[in-house]
């Protein structure tokens, strides 16, 4: 039977999803949780709705965590002991990969043969585990990097730490071993081929999605009331981890420039910064708070803890514009979520953001991180109601092109393709 013939009959029963450094159960914006967590949880739930069981393996960070937790019907999150029962910095995790891999293999060993049909690893640490599990189980490995060290180092933010050589080598190994490589945009596909020598025929582009039922337009007045923001305020917002890569300082510096241009704006300006620094999730973003004081805008800046559920929706709905000033983004889920709520986005023209934001239609793309350029873009949207109204309509329309259902359908096609190719190759070798 040909590989195409196998593909028609193939449907995965159970997928092993590897997410070593962060759990889909964690609140995005805390610790190292972000868009990847949302991606894993949303696609896992959609897979389960299609009859595919999903088991997510992640490192246990507390002795109180049960061995397994049901995220949704058909989706199980397995906590694998590897190192101390506490959050670790990502730089400390490579030394725990042996223990983590052992836990993953031990879990499979207690099941019937052929329990998992495919492995999908997320981030390079998980790819290292997936590579070994792939060879042990005899199933294909699909890998999503989410971020790439060589790309991050080329766009390093001031004060940020370069990714180590060990990560670069680890990524190169995973790229060479994976059966399929899933990327968010064609730009990322080109980066994998050009910078990591990935085989072009192994790379597949699948755009992430957005929960269009949860993130949708609603009452701005109600959202502002819930946040304690005046109904007539000019509201700028940022949501995400507080780290140099995400560049929330760009928003604060641009805000200070706006106030210098028009001192009267201070009376009605509110800047919402929702998120926390990477780490334990308990810290406040002290350096960013100090910057607000230094810039003289601490009176208009409100620092909120990482927001989830309706609280995050309220932040998006309350804002006149959401800023995504990152130095690099493989895609930018925050931009999609905000636009789905009908809020225009001003974003940096980097990475996958030109796909997530339709320039001059759903928001504006800024080609630099220059303070005055950002102040101009923010003012154009936030201070001009006629511009904001047009972009708001375009924002929702643009976001509707993306859904987790569509993302999951594309992933399933890749899974079936990888399984067919893997089994076909095995058949040829056997013959």
From Swiss-Prot:
Keyword set includes Nuclease: no
The keyword Cell membrane is annotated on this UniProt entry: no
Binding site for UDP-N-acetyl-alpha-D-glucosamine: 27-28, 35, 241, 246, 307, 329, 337
GO MF, one example: magnesium ion binding
Positions annotated to bind Mg(2+): 316-317, 319, 343
UniProt keyword annotations, A-Z: Glycosyltransferase, Magnesium, Metal-binding, Transferase
Bilayer-spanning residue ranges: none
Binding, 1D-myo-inositol 3-phosphate: 21, 32-37, 90, 123, 147, 167
Catalytic activity: 1D-myo-inositol 3-phosphate + UDP-N-acetyl-alpha-D-glucosamine = 1D-myo-inositol 2-acetamido-2-deoxy-alpha-D-glucopyranoside 3-phosphate + UDP + H(+)
InterPro entries cross-referenced by the UniProt entry: Glyco_trans_1 (IPR001296), Glyco_trans_4-like_N (IPR028098), Glycosyltransferase_grp1 (IPR050194), Mycothiol_biosynthesis_MshA (IPR017814)
SUPFAM superfamilies (alphabetical): UDP-Glycosyltransferase/glycogen phosphorylase
A Pfam family this chain is assigned to: Glycos_transf_1
Annotated GO biological process: mycothiol biosynthetic process
EC number in record: 2.4.1.250
HAMAP family tied to this protein: MshA (MF_01695)
NCBIfam families: mycothiol_MshA (TIGR03449)
Reported function: Catalyzes the transfer of a N-acetyl-glucosamine moiety to 1D-myo-inositol 3-phosphate to produce 1D-myo-inositol 2-acetamido-2-deoxy-glucopyranoside 3-phosphate in the mycothiol biosynthesis pathway.
Family: Belongs to the glycosyltransferase group 1 family. MshA subfamily.
Assembly mode: Homodimer.
Protein name: D-inositol 3-phosphate glycosyltransferase
Species this chain originates from: Saccharomonospora viridis (strain ATCC 15386 / DSM 43017 / JCM 3036 / CCUG 5913 / NBRC 12207 / NCIMB 9602 / P101) (Thermoactinomyces viridis)
Gene (name only): mshA
């Amino acid at each position: 039977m040909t590989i195409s013939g196998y593909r028609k009959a193939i449907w995965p029963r159970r997928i092993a999803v590897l997410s070593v450094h962060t759990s889909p159960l964690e609140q995005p914006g805390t610790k190292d949780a972000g868009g990847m967590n949302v991606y894993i949880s949303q696609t896992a739930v959609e897979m389960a709705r299609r009859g595919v069981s999903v088991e997510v393996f992640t490192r246990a960070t507390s002795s109180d965590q049960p061995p397994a937790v049901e995220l949704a019907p058909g989706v199980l999150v397995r906590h694998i002991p590897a190192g101390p029962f506490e959050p670790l910095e990502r730089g400390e995790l490579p030394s725990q990969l042996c223990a983590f891999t052992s836990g993953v293999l031990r879990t499979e060993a207690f099941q019937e043969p052929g329990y998992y049909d495919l492995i999908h690893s997320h981030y390079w640490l998980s790819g290292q585990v997936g590579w070994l599990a792939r060879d042990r189980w005899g199933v294909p490995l699909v890998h999503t990097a989410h971020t790439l060290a060589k790309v991050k180092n080329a766009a390093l933010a001031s004060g940020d730490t370069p990714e180590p050589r060990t990560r670069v080598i680890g990524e190169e190994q995973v790229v060479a071993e994976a059966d399929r490589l899933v990327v968010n945009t064609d730009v990322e596909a080109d980066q994998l081929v050009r910078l990591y020598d990935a085989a072009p025929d192994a790379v597949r582009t699948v755009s992430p999605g957005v929960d269009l039922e949860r993130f949708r337009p609603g009452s701005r007045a109600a959202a502002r009331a819930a946040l304690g923001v005046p109904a007539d305020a000019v509201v700028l917002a940022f949501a995400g981890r507080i780290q140099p890569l995400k560049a929330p300082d760009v928003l604060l510096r641009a805000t200070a420039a706006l106030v210098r241009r028009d001192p009267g704006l201070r009376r009605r300006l509110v800047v919402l910064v929702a998120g926390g620094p990477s780490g334990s999730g308990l810290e406040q973003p002290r350096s960013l708070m100090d910057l607000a004081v230094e810039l003289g805008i601490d009176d208009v800046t409100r620092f909120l803890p990482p927001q989830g559920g309706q609280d995050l929706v309220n932040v998006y709905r309350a804002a006149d514009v959401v800023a995504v000033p990152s130095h690099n983004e493989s895609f930018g889920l925050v931009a999609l979520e905000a636009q789905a709520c009908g809020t225009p986005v001003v974003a940096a023209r980097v990475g996958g953001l030109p796909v997530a934001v339709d320039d001059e239609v759903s928001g504006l793309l800024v080609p630099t991180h220059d303070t005055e350029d950002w102040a101009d873009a923010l003012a154009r949207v936030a201070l001009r109601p006629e511009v904001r109204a047009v972009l708001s309509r375009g924002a929702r329309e643009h976001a509707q092109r993306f859904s987790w259902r569509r993302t999951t359908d594309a992933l399933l096609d890749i899974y079936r393709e990888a399984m067919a190719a893997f089994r076909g190759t095995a058949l040829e070798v056997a013959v």
